[in-house]
Design a protein with these regions (language model features):
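Sequence-structural signature of mature extracellular/luminal beta-sheet repeat domains
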Residues: 17-320
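Bacterial N-terminal signal peptides
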Residues: 2-14
Length: 320
């Protein structure tokens, strides 16, 4: 593909033969250290999934959820399309509209799942069955619908619990949307209940705070929550980016090895400095839910509605 000189374009556009218009948008020179100016946005799988979510790099493959269809898929290098990995993924028995959402891998290489249908955090056992890890909160009542999660270096699991995936036939038992910690001994503690619609979650590089993607329709944003209890702080406000051409809100997020924040937002993936400066975007052409790094740490996988995308990055993802 031949690109026009940089002074003619601030947006480098890659046209797919079919599907959404995709591009890399550079807003700050600092983006050059993170993403090549000619980085390609590849559609590596375009399947029958309705809302792809929660990708994780697991045993040499990327796995991700199709939330409404209660299925998790896997994609391995060389596959023409992702194949079914878990069905059901969000319940012990098959049921519609209650699939898994966020996926993660613990320090022992085991797959963890936020399960909407079962309203819990679980682990995939070696026998292919789900092992419940957290089914009730610190007050002894059921969670709303655990949404996304991350794993600390000490093995603790942090997760968000809005009501997005709460089965319609069931009622919330908590009057708030919590962010929780699940310790290795099984104890659940509330980190904060002060955020409405907490969604994506990641630990800071020093493990002292959480970054949270807040899916508030009127005020989508990225916030931090100090784990010492010193409070919350907004890092980036995304409402001004919303438009007909830029669908989606703040949903999933990850940090790279330098502490930059890669969060889904209006238009696709927003790339922010640790201080919250918007450096650029990966524009996916449609609403985009989540992302993760895989392979050697320089490959970013993005779940974008009915598509799984891939972009090579200069910087590695945190943890690689």
């Amino acid at each position: 593909m031949k690109f026009l000189p940089a002074f003619f374009l601030s947006v480098l556009t890659a046209f797919a033969a079919e599907g959404p218009k995709q591009s890399i948008e550079k807003l700050d020179p600092a983006l050059d250290a993170l993403l090549a100016s000619d980085a390609q946005i590849e559609t590596i799988s375009n399947g029958s999934y309705t809302w792809s979510e929660g990708p994780a790099w697991y045993k040499g493959r990327v796995v991700f959820s199709d939330v409404p269809n209660n299925v998790a898929y896997q994609w391995i290098e060389g596959d023409a399309v992702a194949s079914v990995f878990l069905k059901p993924s969000g319940t012990d028995e098959a049921s519609p509209n209650q699939g898994s959402n966020g996926l993660a891998v613990d320090g022992e290489g085991r797959l963890l799942l936020c399960q909407h249908g079962s309203r819990r955090v679980a682990r995939l056992g070696g026998d292919g069955k789900f092992v419940p890890l957290a089914t009730k909160n610190h007050e002894g009542v059921r969670f709303n619908s655990p949404n996304d999660l991350c794993v600390a270096k000490d093995g603790a699991i942090y997760f968000t619990d809005p009501t997005y995936g709460l089965p319609k036939s069931e009622k919330s038992e908590t009057p708030y949307h919590g962010v929780y910690k699940l310790a290795t001994d099984g104890k659940v503690t509330l980190v904060t209940k002060e955020i409405q619609w907490p969604n994506g979650i990641a630990l800071s590089l020093d493990q002292k705070s959480l970054y949270l993607a807040v899916s508030d329709g009127k005020n989508p944003r990225v916030a931090t929550c100090a784990l010492d209890g010193s409070g919350l702080r907004d890092v980036f406000l995304a409402a001004a980016l919303k438009s007909k051409e830029r669908a989606g809100g703040c949903d999933g997020l990850r940090l790279d090895a330098k502490g930059n924040i890669w969060t889904t937002g209006p238009g696709g993936v927003l790339i922010l400095s640790p201080e919250g400066k918007h450096l650029g975007s990966i524009l996916c052409g449609q609403a985009t839910a989540n992302l993760t790094w895989g392979d050697d740490g320089h490959t970013l996988y993005i779940t974008s509605k009915d598509r799984l995308l891939r972009v090579k990055t200069k910087v590695k993802g945190a943890g690689f």
